[in-house]
């Protein structure tokens, strides 16, 4: 009798396909981003970035301290400061942002007629 009762509790319910959680989705997105070739900005790209952001010799150190001395990376779509990958795709005020899309940078250059 005891064995029969225990066997009732040991029965496994049929597993249903579970939807991925938000954490799993973010992990998958990060893995996809890591699969893309990430590299440092070329000197030409860095110069474009500086122009678009209005970085001049007068405010260089303010930006340099904020961006860890311009250790900027790109995957072809986004530019971000190394270590701030979580900022990619987020809309933050310009003075708090640590990731920018190339589209945003191009639009800034157009606005400034550069």
Swiss-Prot record:
Highest taxon in the source lineage: Bacteria
Compositional bias of kind Basic and acidic residues: 9-37
Signal peptide: none
Pfam families, per database record: Aq_1974-like
Region described as Disordered: 1-37
Protein name: Uncharacterized protein aq_1974
């Amino acid at each position: 009798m005891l064995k029969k009762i225990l066997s009732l509790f040991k029965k496994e319910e049929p597993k249903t396909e579970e939807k991925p959680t938000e954490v799993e989705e973010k992990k998958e997105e990060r893995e996809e981003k890591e699969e893309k070739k990430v590299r440092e900005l070329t000197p030409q790209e860095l110069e474009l970035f500086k122009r678009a952001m209005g970085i001049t010799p007068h405010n260089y150190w303010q930006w340099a301290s904020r961006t860890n001395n311009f250790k900027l990376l790109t995957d072809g779509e986004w530019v971000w400061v190394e270590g701030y990958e979580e900022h990619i795709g987020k809309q933050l005020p310009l003075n708090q942002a640590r990731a920018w899309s190339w589209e945003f940078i191009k639009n800034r250059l157009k606005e400034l007629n550069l």
